[in-house]
């Protein structure tokens, strides 16, 4: 039985809170709260305004922020504040991405982070992905293979096991591989 290492240290030797602090995660089913936008980004009542704005800008939400009369103090939803704003699923996903960036952990895990975005917003995230994650180690989880093309390494899972690993072009050359099979199954809907 193997073990997972971080900086050559078995992860079971880490303090749990310390270990969890090195990860920022954007799940496809996340929760925003009926508090201010800045508090949602920071996941805390106290937050750094400049950092929250910077993270919202990187996540593609800055234009909407500028249209909000109360800025970062604008309540998300109207549950606790009649002047709160309703946001779309895509906008909520951008706020969730900003939250992960705000945490500024060395590892960022993105589980279908563009699922609720329209195609243009999704393209913006892909085209700026390296700028968004910067020097962090990013794990990008997606069933949509076209969204994995920009990844440095792609791991293909089948039955809970890694069955292929490599870059898009190389994986596509293996006409008997699972990646090729999945890619062509999805591509048939685009032609």
Segments from the language model and where they lie:
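C-terminal portion of ABC ATPase nucleotide-binding domains
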Residues: 71, 127, 144, 149-191
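ABC ATPase NBD Q-loop/coupling interface
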Residues: 1-18, 123, 127
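Catalytic Walker B motif of ABC-type/P-loop ATPase nucleotide-binding domains
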Residues: 108-112
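ABC-fold ATPase nucleotide-binding domain signature/coupling loops
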Residues: 62-95, 104-106, 189-191
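Conserved "ABC signature" C-loop
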Residues: 30-82, 178
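Helix N-cap at the start of a conserved alpha-helix in ABC-type nucleotide-binding domains
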Residues: 119-121
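Conserved catalytic loops of ABC-family nucleotide-binding domains
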Residues: 131-140, 148
